[in-house]
Amino acid sequence: MNKRELYDSFEELEKQTKFTLSQIERIKAEMGKVIEKNAELEIENQHLREHLHEIEQKQKGNKEGTELSKSRKNLEKLYEEGFHVCNVDNMYGSRRVNDEPCVFCQDVIYGDRH
């Protein structure tokens, strides 16, 4: 190999090395963006999990508070069998016409429970 060929080979190697270095820098920049996005998503995911946990706890608390008492369950059963359980116009115990819903009965069963 003469000096000219050696010099040309060295220049070609230098070009390839510069190209490889530019690729490495580009990949490094992309990798930095991916790592940053991943960190953001992990934080967001953690916040969403905490929010979901709070919602589940509230729903669990609401379900415990919405359980009907034994007497209201009995009224609900009578209502489902087609009888009034409200005392509007002395209708308690009378048959509901065509089993139509009665908001007064529903209020007695499911209404405010303080």
UniProtKB/Swiss-Prot annotation:
Its main location: cytoplasm. The keyword Transmembrane does not apply. Its cofactor is Zn(2+). The keyword Protein biosynthesis does not apply. InterPro entries: YabA. It comes from the Bacteria. It is found in: Cytoplasm, Nucleoid. Binds 1 zinc ion per subunit. GO terms for biological process: DNA replication. One of its GO terms (cellular component) is nucleoid. Belongs to the YabA family. Involved in control of chromosome replication initiation. Inhibits the cooperative binding of DnaA to the oriC region, thus negatively regulating initiation of chromosome replication. Inhibits the ability of DnaA-ATP to form a helix on DNA; does not disassemble preformed DnaA-DNA helices. Decreases the residence time of DnaA on the chromosome at its binding sites (oriC, replication forks and promoter-binding sites). Tethers DnaA to the replication machinery via the DNA polymerase beta sliding clamp subunit (dnaN). Homotetramer. Interacts with both DnaA and DnaN, acting as a bridge between these two proteins. This is Replication initiation control protein YabA. It comes from Ligilactobacillus salivarius (strain UCC118) (Lactobacillus salivarius). The lineage of its organism: Bacteria, Bacillati, Bacillota, Bacilli, Lactobacillales.
